[in-house]
């Protein structure tokens, strides 16, 4: 079920050489390390969190810890591409989101088994996610 759609953004540290640009292209990103978040060894490409993850990169770092992504962004001038939503508690004051010029849309949603009912905690979680919808 789709919660909302969003245009991809490039997350990078506020002092990154590309940080002052109003928009960033994939070509602009070539010299910098790309960070890909993976949730497990057998993660399906159909449920990848990053758009453009299949586009070749000269330098790519795969991480499974969100804190590590922030540390790599701060220490290596690395970047990741995501929805534009970034929690402040993950060093958010030092990380910025710049729109990506590519003509793509991310669809943010969830999958549940149709034979099961969503728990109360699950409903609360989805209500919290909806607060991030870029309306």
Labelled PLM ranges:
Residues 1-34:
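Flexible hinge/capping segments at coil-to-helix
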Residues 14, 41, 83-86:
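Short secondary-structure boundary segments
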Residues 23, 63-66:
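Structural motif corresponding to alpha-helix initiation and N-cap regions
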Residues 26, 31-55, 118-122:
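Secondary-structure junction motif
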Residues 15-24, 102-104, 115-121:
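Short helix-loop capping/hinge motifs at secondary-structure junctions, enriched
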Residues 1-2, 6-7, 67-115:
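Beta-alpha-beta core module
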């Amino acid at each position: 079920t789709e919660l909302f759609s969003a245009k991809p953004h490039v997350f990078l540290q506020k002092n990154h050489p590309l940080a002052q640009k109003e928009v960033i292209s994939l070509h602009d990103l070539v010299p910098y390390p790309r960070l890909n978040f993976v949730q497990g060894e057998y993660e399906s490409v159909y449920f990848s969190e990053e758009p453009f993850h299949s586009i070749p990169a000269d330098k790519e770092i795969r991480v499974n810890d969100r804190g590590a992504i922030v540390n790599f962004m701060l220490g290596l001038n690395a970047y990741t591409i995501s929805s534009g939503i970034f929690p402040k508690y993950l060093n958010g004051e030092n990380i910025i989101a710049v729109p990506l010029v590519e003509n793509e849309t991310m669809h943010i949603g969830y999958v549940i088994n149709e034979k099961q009912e969503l728990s109360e905690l699950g409903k609360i979680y989805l209500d919290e996610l909806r607060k991030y919808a870029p309306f």
